Amino acid sequence: MVSIWPTVDYRSENFQEMKEKGYLIRTDRGFRIVMDFQGNTVHYDATNPAAREYVWQKAKKNYYDKGIKVFWLDEAEPEYSVYDFDNYRYHIGPNVQVGNIYPALYAKTFFDGMKAEGQENIINLLRCAWAGSQKYGALVWSGDIHSSFSSLRNQLAAGLNMGLAGIPWWTTDIGGFHGGDPKDPKFQELLVRWFEYGTFCPVMRLHGYREPLKEPMGKEGGAACVSGADNEVWSFGEEAYEICKKYLALRESMKPYITCLLYTSPSPRDTR
């Protein structure tokens, strides 16, 4: 699995071509910069069929053809530095009217490309979804949530609501994403409780940006990013580790049951 964002940096070799062909989100006012994380960027316009094909061909050449068959499609809302929805224009209309469809068409970008390659049982991890996203192999997680018991409580409602919306494959960042010191007994308690809950979620996933942060590993690209503290099951003390091992074994024993649910839940096979 590799992580892909829908943002295109001004410095990208593809930026000018995508801009000229209308493959990027437009703005009615101000500079055409919609997000400034790690550079000045604009999202590709997932509502434009030609833009979807263009992005897939780039991903196919650089990842799929080299053996990557699962994608982590982050930033799927999409996220903006300034949420001025009236200012953004998509191929099919203004963001304020059609913006919620973006994550579904982001998922469709990769689903259609992978299906055309003959792949079956397609599933990709996304940070957001919309009605119908299950048609495009969307496995949704609840985003960059805080590491707190109140946040854990919110996941119960979020997961139920996602299921009621017909999107069965859902998960959370066990322990929350933002914060949490692996050596802090209070966080260790939260992590264990969240791990127990995560065992019975459709997908079990340990992920987070732990503290204290580590120094960057390099000066360019992703290596220039600050990394979080260790976040493996053995990172939270021996007592927590023993409990986590118990629940990992339980999850492993549930694989036949989970597989059965996979083939009986709404999926691309029966929601054409």
Regions found by a protein language model. Give the residues of each.
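Aromatic- and carboxylate-enriched substrate-binding clefts and catalytic-loop regions
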Residues: 1-242
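A penicillin-recognizing enzyme superfamily signal
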Residues: 113, 254, 265
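Catalytic cores of secreted or luminal carbohydrate-active enzymes
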Residues: 246-262
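Conserved small/polar residues in nucleotide/adenosyl-binding loops
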Residues: 263-270
